[in-house]
C-alpha cells in the first residue's frame, strides 16, 4: 500500500514523485499549486510520509490529526473558542515532520523563525520534512526569510510548499523549487470515490458541477448545492434590481474568507460565460452549469452581452487584489460597483 492511495487523481504526479524518491533524486524543495479544494495538502502529506517512511499527520488532509490536537488543547485548559480561532504556530509529528498553516488568515514570519531556530536549523541523519500550507497568504518578509534556508537546506531536510496561486510566489522561490501542478480529478474517478465514501443521490450531477474539485463535489453531494456558486448566482440576480442591491449583496458576503470570495469570483465568470451562451442560443450540452439554466434564463435579458463580458476582467482584477492582500471588504465593494455600472444602462 502506498501513502499516495489517499490522494485522488494526480496519477502522473504520483508516478513521477515516487520514481524520484526511489532514485534519491527528489529536489529538496517542492512547490505544489492548484485551486482551492483539490486537496493539495493531502498530496503534500503523502509525499512527506513517503520521504519519512511512515504516515505523518493524517492522510485526510491532516483533519484527523488537527482534530486530535484541538481536543488535547481543550483538555489542557484552553478555551474552545481560542482553539477554533487560532491554530498553533507549528504542528510537529514525532520530531521529523513539521507543518506550518496560516494562523487565522495569514502565515507569519514568526512561525518560520520558530521552526527554524528551535527545530530544523541542524543536520539530521534521517529524513525530515516541512510542509508550508497556504503560501498564497505569505508576505515578502516571510518569503525572503524562507529563501535562505531553501537555498542552503540542512542535510536530509525537505520542504513542501503549498499554494492556491503560484502567481503570488516570489520568482526566487519558484526558481528553487520543483513545481508540482495539482489538477482536477477525472469525473469517473471522482464518482467512484464519492460512491465508496457512502454519498448517495445524484453523485454524477455533483461531480459535473464541481468540475473535478473533490471538496466542492462532496459539498454538493451533502447539501444539494455549492454555497459559493449559490452566492455567485444571487449576486447576478441582485445586480439587476433597482434598489437595495448593494446592501443585499454586501450582507450576503459579510465575513467570508478570502478563499471563499475567490471561489465566488470564479463562479461569476463561469455563470457569465453560460449566460452569454444562452443569449446566443447555444445548446444545453455546451453549458457548464446547465442545472442553473432556469435561474440564468430569468435574468439573461437584463444582462447585455457587453455587461456579461465585463464580468471576466472585473473578477480577475478583484482576484488579483485579494492575492495582494487588499482588504476583502474593499474588493467586494469594488466588484459590486463595477458590475452594477456595467449593467446600469440595461436596467
Residue ranges of each PLM-predicted region?
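Charged, glycine-rich active-site and insertion segments that engage polyanionic ligands
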Residues: 1-88, 155-157, 164-347
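Conserved alpha-helical scaffold flanking the Walker A/P-loop in AAA+ ATPase domains
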Residues: 15-21, 85-88, 106-129, 137, ...
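A short hydrophobic beta-strand->loop->alpha-helix junction that borders the nucleotide-binding pocket
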Residues: 33-35, 99-104
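Extended basic-aromatic, gly/pro-enriched interface segments that bind polyanionic ligands
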Residues: 92
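Residues immediately C-terminal
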Residues: 99, 106, 137, 152, ...
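Loop/turn-to-beta-strand initiation segments
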Residues: 124-129, 154-160
